[in-house]
Amino acid sequence: MSSLCASNCYPSSSSINLFSNNNNPTKPFLLSLRFASSNSLPFVAPLKFSTTNHVLSNSRFSSNRIQRRLFLLRCVSEESQPSLSIGNGGSEERVNVLVIGGGGREHALCHALKRSPSCDSVLCAPGNAGISSSGDATCVPDLDISDSLAVISFCQKWNVGLVVVGPEVPLVAGLANDLVKAGILTFGPSSQAAALEGSKNFMKNLCHKYNIPTAKYKTFSDASAAKEYIQEQGAPIVIKADGLAAGKGVTVAMELEEAFEAVDSMLVKGVFGSAGCQVVVEEFLEGEEASFFALVDGENAIPLESAQDHKRVGDGDTGPNTGGMGAYSPAPVLTKELQDFVMESIIHPTVKGMAEEGCKFVGVLFAGLMIEKKSGLPKLIEFNVRFGDPECQVLMMRLESDLAKVLLAACKGELSGVSLDWSKDSAMVVVMASNGYPGSYEKGSIIKNLEEAERVAPGVKVFHAGTGLDSEGNVVATGGRVLGVTAKGKDLEEARERAYSAVQQINWPGGFFRHDIGWRALRQKQVATKEE
């Protein structure tokens, strides 16, 4: 069989014209150093706020003055942060880190990187209101992350030693390709390797070629042929758009008519554009879903802790799918034996297969799994090429290792022998979303009492996703999923109690949340207790 990467529909960044040719580096906004009330660490905050476009802007500070502030930030950080070990890999260097993205996942990454002894300072583009105001990073909202030349220029100007790309879209577009070509260490796969998420057909073909356990499937570009196959297979059945569809490209059809409608919407009506020019028709798997993450350096992979999210919008796993309404870690369904099985049967063959196909994978490999009811073993549902959101929030709350150091090791191909340290505590995140999500929703509703929520108990952190500031400085909702109220506890029950206590403190009539995050794990524990 020929190389899968050679036939990949996502070309290398040198052959696509997704970025502008603007060679002018984007200037960071005006900075001010102050101390957060919750701890002794300083953070860089905006001095000027534009009421016309809801972004922080720059007007008059010189590069030298900004550099002096970053230097002061580094000095205080050196005195206040403990040293953490990641194992045998990595180096002792300290770097400025740029996180690409502006959601809850990126806020969690910034929060973890801020604690890293190997990190001098954390920048986030574009970031959001919560990332900036919490002091977890310096936000650079004016940096156009779709313009690779602007990002490269910014990194060179501010001596950025590591770029961490959060969302999948810039990865599929080839941002990592261009940064690596410019000599900038980048944690995130090339556009070719990102096809593991960017093309369902590519991923399924790789699984078939390298014997990776997944659901039976067939790919179609003709609606009539797809419907004929669906008629033969029967319902329930799964219909997936081949490309990126903002999390809306999967239909789990319980009836044949629903499956036919999904095929027509993608192949005939073109609701997902080019992302739906092919559909993958997949066997329905019955069981329990779980999320598995591994850090990959091109040849080696090390597992992260397990997590489980909640896709459906309503309590009891009802309603349409979302980007995720909550998560917890660890996930009891992924036992040590099953985690070993996933590494040996799914992760390692994928990493090896990608290398053999000529597109080595560097970044985080997120395997969406189904623990099959009939066999008790995991099958791969999908690959994502970035941290999950909201799973990243609970993982970063439990991580005790130096995140910057291990990501640098991954970028340099030095993960062999590296191990990570994790808190024995459990963590849970409850997502608060705008009323109407995942359908249409209004923006601009005011959110209050966020600081009170973080003070309700130890180990509580509110991660921001779709937030901004209005003209009076109030935090307002700007997206569908808006907040990730996260808490640690000695066990899942305590983490859940703290998270929901914090949620109750938040005054936001324009939002809603699920009331049953963690129900599967808690039910399993109750059953186990009764059996004892």
UniProtKB/Swiss-Prot annotation:
Gene label: PUR2
Task: Give the protein name, as stated in the record.
Answer: Phosphoribosylamine--glycine ligase, chloroplastic
User: Which terms in the Gene Ontology molecular function aspect does this entry carry?
Assistant: ATP binding; metal ion binding; phosphoribosylamine-glycine ligase activity
Top-level taxonomy: Eukaryota, Viridiplantae, Streptophyta, Embryophyta, Tracheophyta
**Reaction equation(s) it catalyzes:** 5-phospho-beta-D-ribosylamine + glycine + ATP = N(1)-(5-phospho-beta-D-ribosyl)glycinamide + ADP + phosphate + H(+)
**UniProt record, GO biological process:** 'de novo' IMP biosynthetic process; purine nucleobase biosynthetic process
Q: Cellular component GO terms, alphabetically?
A: chloroplast; chloroplast stroma
- A Pfam family of this chain: GARS_A
Question: What does the UniProt keyword field contain?
Answer: ATP-binding, Chloroplast, Ligase, Nucleotide-binding, Plastid, Purine biosynthesis, Transit peptide
Question: Which PROSITE patterns does the annotation name?
Answer: ATP_GRASP, GARS
Name its pathway: Purine metabolism; IMP biosynthesis via de novo pathway; N(1)-(5-phospho-D-ribosyl)glycinamide from 5-phospho-alpha-D-ribose 1-diphosphate: step 2/2
EC identifiers of the protein: 6.3.4.13
- Which part of the chain is the ATP-grasp domain? 204-412
- The transit peptide extends across 1-75
Q: Where in the cell is it found?
A: Plastid, Chloroplast
Q: Please report which protein family the annotation says this sequence is part of.
A: Belongs to the GARS family.
Question: What InterPro entries does UniProt report for this protein, alphabetically?
Answer: ATP-grasp, ATP_grasp_subdomain_1, PreATP-grasp_dom_sf, PRibGlycinamid_synth_ATP-grasp, PRibGlycinamide_synth, PRibGlycinamide_synth_C-dom, PRibGlycinamide_synth_C_sf, PRibGlycinamide_synth_CS
What is the originating organism of this protein? Answer: Arabidopsis thaliana (Mouse-ear cress)
Major subcellular location class: plastid
